[in-house]
Curated annotation (Swiss-Prot):
Subunit structure, as described in the record: Homohexamer. Forms an RuvA(8)-RuvB(12)-Holliday junction (HJ) complex. HJ DNA is sandwiched between 2 RuvA tetramers; dsDNA enters through RuvA and exits via RuvB. An RuvB hexamer assembles on each DNA strand where it exits the tetramer. Each RuvB hexamer is contacted by two RuvA subunits (via domain III) on 2 adjacent RuvB subunits; this complex drives branch migration. In the full resolvosome a probable DNA-RuvA(4)-RuvB(12)-RuvC(2) complex forms which resolves the HJ.
Origin superkingdom: Bacteria
HAMAP family: DNA_HJ_migration_RuvB
Source organism (scientific name): Bradyrhizobium sp. (strain ORS 278)
Location in or out of the cell: Cytoplasm
Enzyme class, UniProt record, top EC level: hydrolase
Binding site for Mg(2+): T68
GO biological process per UniProt: DNA recombination; DNA repair
Protein name stated in the entry: Holliday junction branch migration complex subunit RuvB
Gene3D superfamilies: 1.10.8.60, P-loop containing nucleotide triphosphate hydrolases (3.40.50.300), Winged helix-like DNA-binding domain superfamily/Winged helix DNA-binding domain (1.10.10.10)
Keywords: ATP-binding, Cytoplasm, DNA damage, DNA recombination, DNA repair, DNA-binding, Hydrolase, Nucleotide-binding
Purpose of the protein: The RuvA-RuvB-RuvC complex processes Holliday junction (HJ) DNA during genetic recombination and DNA repair, while the RuvA-RuvB complex plays an important role in the rescue of blocked DNA replication forks via replication fork reversal (RFR). RuvA specifically binds to HJ cruciform DNA, conferring on it an open structure. The RuvB hexamer acts as an ATP-dependent pump, pulling dsDNA into and through the RuvAB complex. RuvB forms 2 homohexamers on either side of HJ DNA bound by 1 or 2 RuvA tetramers; 4 subunits per hexamer contact DNA at a time.
Keyword flag Nucleotide-binding: yes
Region (Small ATPAse domain (RuvB-S)): 184-254
Amino acid sequence: MKPPARMVSPERRSDDVGDTALRPQQLSEFVGQQQARANLSIFIEAARKRGEALDHVLFVGPPGLGKTTLAQIVARELGVGFRATSGPVIAKAGDLAALLTNLEERDVLFIDEIHRLSPAVEEVLYPAMEDFQLDLIIGEGPAARSVKIDLSKFTLVGATTRAGLLTNPLRDRFGIPIRLNFYTVEELEGIVTRGARVLGIGMTPDGANEIARRARGTPRIAGRLLRRVRDFASAADASAIDRAIADHALSALEVDAAGLDAMDRRYLSTIALNYGGGPVGVETMAAALSEPRDAIEDIIEPYLIQCGYLQRTPRGRLLTSHAFKHLGMAEPANRDPSQIGLFGNDDD
């Protein structure tokens, strides 16, 4: 049975449909990613003045940081059409050809999870990006022939959470690579405050700070927490969300002051109580938690590592002193974390 979706998951959830109303519509409304915004603004303005298609753009970064939103803003700022799809959806070369041949001049085609394109589809994409041509094989066997189709000059905007899985030929064809970083608490406060205004609920500065601190540096999570806190405020007939309401709501949702949820705390406490703080292998943790290895490595661990609660060492996963302090546990006296993980690669 599939586990319930986590409140603090950066991945898109089915209940995130309300997230659309909170999204900024222009670069000037987009909070955070200052350098990325500044560069994009220049590139867009230059392309607009020349009347040319913007060079191909690649957004790289963890989920929930605004890659899709920025792609939509790019098309809106350019005043052109926007088509969106994702890597897994484009199963064969014909699917990609259908998308590309329907694009108008200077349109934006957005491909999310572009690292999941099949090699066969990538081969068709290369000449389309570079020469704005499609090279297709029509027919089979001796009757097969190559056909070239001219395309409108378009902008491909790709998004990926795993840049290392992109092939070099594909990566090199993006003239504008942009890396998105986690947001600061101050930036998330601005996002929460704007979101509250859009949703028509009052928000005090300390209420916005409380939500922002627990949003794990991710706007998608901040918006999700805001919508749930608004429910608590509405049920209490409160005209505004303050720190007390936000704290009560988020505590009821099991999101603690550091943004950790029940799964995070279970992971940390399992290592602390069952394995003396580690090191312990990821396969052992997968068995102990009844979770697949991929879920542990891609969903649970990144934020714990980012916050300094966990180390990946050659000998396994190791809790830091910070983790024991957060759990309210005493650190084992015979442990010396500073001597572990200084050399070698992460464990398999």
